[in-house]
A protein has these predicted regions:
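Active-site phosphate-binding and catalytic loops of NTP-dependent enzymes
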Residues: 147-151, 212, 603-611, 934-938
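Residue-level signature of outer-membrane beta-barrel architecture
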Residues: 227, 309-311, 322, 341, ...
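Short, small/polar-rich motifs associated with maturation and membrane association
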Residues: 1-340, 345-348, 352-360, 431, ...
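Outer-membrane beta-barrel "beta-signal"
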Residues: 595-599, 724-727, 925, 929, ...
Length: 990
């Protein structure tokens, strides 16, 4: 009995001791203006005890150890505060100059709201939460003026994204923006090698005030990617993420006839004999080639791991990510591994240095018959829409043959073609930077940085000898390609910040930058392979053919920038840059670029104080400046020769005339902007811009007597003009609820101002485009007037006339003479570049449950649907291929109101193929749940666990009949379709 009493007493004492070892701490958090801060994080350093403030800025933190002396309070955009644990804690958080900072190129980052230029920052979470293999794809619709098109859903390719900022700035030089990763210029391949979870932010620089500091490479804007770094005075935080899912077709391909419909059509139009008709009818096959060619459950898997933290002087971020994804076509897949290390240390009060580097390796297997714009009969998209459904694969898979194709000389299963001609691409991409930063006196920062962007690419392609028809002659072939490229960048800057009294704040920056790049490519091929097991080049019985190419280019630049503000009310910014490029002749090698901008923060004015209860921010800004475009060939200014065979002997020929007058393409851009916030909930950004391209590089036609067809010259001028609108509205923001709506919209018009030879118009029938001074780039084609209801003949409008397609022939305005088709080309009025781009989305959160969606759209877009031509053409139908069900509406008898002419007429390349490809697409839909904080505290191990389910490209609204309306092309043929994806993920933070 005494023993039991002793044990009970000990238990009570232990319970009391435990209770006394923990306590409840309450407090209140405000900003410098005394406004409550909702969502601030309050934690006990070194423990898992954590909570957040409510809508009134109040918090209750339970389970605080009695030994705890300090609390850490943090919030995005504000300095972290460390306060004593005593009574009712009152915390005032001050703005952090770098918390909500944007990096606009060189020097220290700037606080949001003090940047004069037109820039937009997107947080890394936007990219991290979207299952895209290319980070640019996740930005669609997020930034006004940033237009992104995914041209292929093939995971076996890397260069499948088109990016433009504020329209297309050049017709011959590149219109791609400059991509910078942690201060190092990088190529588009880097976008497919970045781990989404490694990205801290992506900032788009759009106007001259923001981009002019980059000079000759920034004519088309700048996309600056900042990767995650460690945090000072924070213990290690470990993050692990696992995602699994599958991909499928985003939308059906075409509308092919069924087996019975096609057989009836072919019999009716004399394409097959009655006995053939009966033969296929009796067999009864109705193969769905789309299901045969595309996998609607192609698996994908990603794993991301990172650890970040830091001491008082050293910070670190280390990560690894792995992606494995199968394509929806047979034989296409990608495996990608990415490693990153970012380390910074403050060795002395005046010395800081660090490195940021990543290396990525990918192995891509591509379906060689699924290449974009391929009309190969074995292309998956072509098979899905064009192969007769009364064909079918043989049941004996060893034959690999397609039943019913005897008249075609026996066709094989397209998936066997992939096995017979495998192709593998290996990519190794490195991006790294090392810097040293010295602060010898207060306000002065000297920085030197060395960066390297390098790519190693290896391609291995084989045609197996076991497949005689594909290999030709019963032997195979092998091809190897190796590409190595590198770009070294060294940057030295001096930045000095100082104040003149308390009202005048200055930041002066001067710098120098040098870039040295090289490219080497080697290709070799051997024929005569005799054994599928021996596919090396040395196994070929025919001597290998080899080729090699290489080039180098260099830049040398000097630049400066001055920033000034008066009382943080009036801001001014001026930049200058001098660039020299080896891509131009000595007389035009160097160019100067300038910019200037001003901004007025009206809410700092005394007369605006009465409106401060509802108008929380109002800024006006304006800028003008110049940038350059040097994205042309490396030796375009030189005289080049080539070698060939003539009369059985080696001969030389002129490959390119000397072009010493070739100079810089310059752009002068004006921007006027307004930013306003209402009630601290609704934010509006508006920008108007005028982007003038001068000395535009154009491929100028030459007389054939010169022996050349064209020559690059600075002869053109072009203008892009537009507006951009961004709206963000926090509809509800309480302790438990958060409802947000956001939208972006941009309108851009393109106009030719000057052409070569003083011409007012230049027609390019081959490209279906007409260049007309005073107008934008429009499609140039015969205008389809419809089908004559009397005889089923196609009708076209005569030059100078236009209208809708109808059924009544008017000889004054129309013609039915197919022989005149070449003389009927005219301006269609349909724009080559869509003027309207945008996106919108919402987020609804209740406690830990969140539903978010993002849509993107393009309006006023047109593309020539060459697939529709192939699937409705009489000449193609005569070969026995399947047709679109629209062909059932061909004209048959007088009085028919048909959309296609009678079968006896050949289809022509006219506007009946020019389709409205405007679209709206649900890019991402995500449902996530964060487990309660109290659960995490109870474990004393986890900080957060989030479960997510995400859908990508869930539906598309469009009138376009082709494979995918998103493709950035004037003509579509056999494009690899977009994919819909579903992923389930778990994110754990320790």
């Amino acid at each position: 009995m005494n023993k039991k009493l002793v044990l009970m007493g000990a238990g009570l004492l232990l319970t009391a001791a435990t209770a006394s070892a923990q306590k409840l701490v309450t407090g209140h958090v405000t900003d410098a203006q005394g406004q409550p801060v909702m969502g601030a994080t309050v934690r006990v350093p070194g423990t898992k005890v954590i909570t957040t403030t409510d809508a009134n800025g109040n918090f209750k933190l339970s389970g605080v150890p009695a030994s705890a002396k300090k609390l850490m309070v943090s919030y995005i955009g504000m300095n972290t505060a460390t306060v004593s644990v005593a009574g009712n804690v009152q915390v005032v958080l001050k703005d952090n100059e770098l918390g909500e900072a944007v990096v606009i190129g060189y020097g220290t980052a700037k606080k949001v709201g003090t940047v004069v230029g037109s820039v937009k920052k997107v947080g890394g979470s936007v990219v991290e939460n979207k299952p895209a293999t290319n980070v640019a794809d996740a930005l669609q619709g997020q930034v006004a003026g940033l237009n992104i098109a995914n041209n292929s859903g093939d995971v076996g390719t890397t260069q499948n994204i088109t990016i433009n900022v504020r329209g297309v700035g050049s017709l011959s030089a590149s219109s791609e923006p400059l991509i910078v990763v942690d201060g190092v210029p990088a190529g588009a391949a880097m976008l497919s090698m970045l781990g989404p979870s490694d990205i801290e932010s992506i900032t788009t620089l759009k106007d001259a005030s923001a981009t002019s500091i980059y000079g000759s490479r920034a004519a088309n804007g700048v996309i600056y990617i900042t990767t995650k770094k460690g945090r000072s005075n924070e213990k290690a935080q470990i993050h692990l993420s696992q995602n699994v899912g599958w991909s499928q077709l985003a939308r059906s391909i075409g509308n092919p006839m069924s087996a019975d419909e096609l057989l009836d059509f072919q019999l009716e139009n004399g394409i097959i004999y009655p006995q053939t008709y009966a033969y296929f009818k009796g067999h009864g096959a109705n193969t769905d080639w789309q299901k045969h060619m595309f996998d609607n459950a192609a698996p994908l898997h990603t794993t991301d791991f990172s650890i970040r933290g830091g001491s008082e002087k050293t910070t670190y971020y280390v990560s690894a990510s792995f992606l494995k994804q199968n394509g929806i076509t047979y034989g296409s897949s990608v495996k990608r591994t990415t490693l990153r290390t970012n380390i910074e240390t403050k060795a002395k009060d005046w010395l800081k240095f660090g490195i940021a580097q990543s290396i990525g390796f990918s192995e891509n297997s591509a379906n060689r018959f699924a290449s974009t714009r391929s009309s190969n009969v074995n292309s998956p998209s072509t098979v899905a829409a064009s192969w007769p459904r009364y064909w079918e694969p043989y049941s004996m898979k060893s034959t690999h043959q397609i039943w019913g194709t005897d008249s075609w000389g026996i066709l094989f299963d397209p998936n066997y073609y992939v096995d017979a001609a495998p192709s593998k691409v290996e990519n190794l991409v490195y991006n790294g930077t090392a810097f040293a930063e010295i602060t010898p006196v207060k306000g002065l920062t000297l920085r030197s940085q060395l960066g390297l962007y390098a790519i190693g690419n290896r391609v291995k392609s084989v045609i197996m000898p076991s497949y005689a028809q594909l290999a030709g002659g019963g032997t195979g072939s092998a091809e190897r390609q190796s590409v190595q490229s590198s770009s070294w960048t060294i940057t030295n800057t001096a930045e000095y910040k100082f104040n003149v009294n308390d009202n005048n704040h200055f930041t002066l920056l001067v710098g120098q930058e040098g870039i040295k790049a090289s490219y080497d490519e080697f290709t070799a091929q051997a024929d005569g392979l005799l054994d599928d097991r021996l596919t090396n080049l040395s196994a070929g019985t025919v001597p290998a053919a080899a080729s090699e190419s290489n080039y180098k280019y260099e830049y040398l630049s000097f630049f400066g920038r001055a920033d000034y503000d008066f009382k943080q009310k009036y801001y001014a910014n001026f930049t200058v840059r001098s660039d020299a490029s080896s891509r131009f002749g000595k007389s035009n090698r160097r160019a100067m670029f300038y910019s200037g901008g001003v901004m007025w923060d009206m809410m700092q004015e005394a007369f605006m104080r009465p409106a401060s209860t509802w108008l929380t921010n109002l800024q006006l800004k304006a800028s003008v400046g110049s940038t350059g475009n040097s994205s042309i060939g490396n030796y375009t200014h030189l005289s080049l020769s080539g070698n060939t065979q003539y009369g059985g002997e080696q001969a030389s020929y002129y490959a390119q005339f000397p072009n010493s007058d070739l100079g810089w393409e310059k752009q002068i851009q004006t921007n006027v902007g307004l930013t306003a916030s209402f009630f601290g909930k609704l934010t509006l950004d508006f920008n108007w811009y005028n982007r003038k391209t001068k000395n535009m590089l154009m491929s100028m036609p030459l007389p054939y007597t010169t022996g050349m067809s064209a020559m690059m010259k600075n002869v053109g001028e072009m203008t892009n003009r537009g507006v951009e609108v961004e709206i963000n509205y926090d509809i509800v923001r309480t302790k438990d609820w958060y409802v947000n709506f956001h939208t972006t919209y941009s309108y851009n018009t393109n106009k030719i101002d000057k052409l070569f030879y003083g011409l007012d118009q230049w027609d390019d029938k081959g490209s279906l485009v007409s260049y007309m001074v005073g107008k934008g780039l429009n499609y140039y084609m015969p205008i389809f007037a419809g089908v004559d209801e009397q005889d089923g003949a196609p009708m076209w409008y005569k030059v100078g006339y236009s209208g809708e397609a109808g059924y009544t022939y008017n000889p004054e305005t129309m013609t039915k003479d197919e022989s005149q088709i070449e003389s009927l080309y005219q301006d269609t009025g349909k724009k080559l570049f869509a003027p309207h781009h945008g996106g919108f989305g919402f987020q609804v959160s209740w406690k830990g449950l969140t539903l978010a969606a993002d849509f993107s759209y393009v309006l006023g877009k047109y593309m020539v649907n060459n697939d529709y031509y192939l699937n409705t053409s009489s000449s193609v139908a005569a070969q026995g291929l399947n047709l679109d069900r629209d062909a059932l509406q061909m004209w048959k008898k007088p009085g028919d109101h048909a959309i296609l002419p009678a079968f006896k007429y050949n289809s022509q390349f006219d506007t009946h193929l020019l389709e409205n490809s405007s679209f709206m697409r649900l890019k991402n839909l995500q449902l996530s749940y964060d487990l309660p904080t109290t659960w995490m505290q109870a474990t004393r191990f986890f900080e957060n666990i989030r479960i997510t389910f995400t859908g990508r490209n869930l539906f598309t609204v469009t009138k376009f009949k082709g494979v995918d309306p998103e493709v950035d092309s004037s003509l579509t043929t056999g494009n690899y379709p977009a994919t819909r994806q579903y992923t389930l993920g778990v994110d754990v933070t320790f």
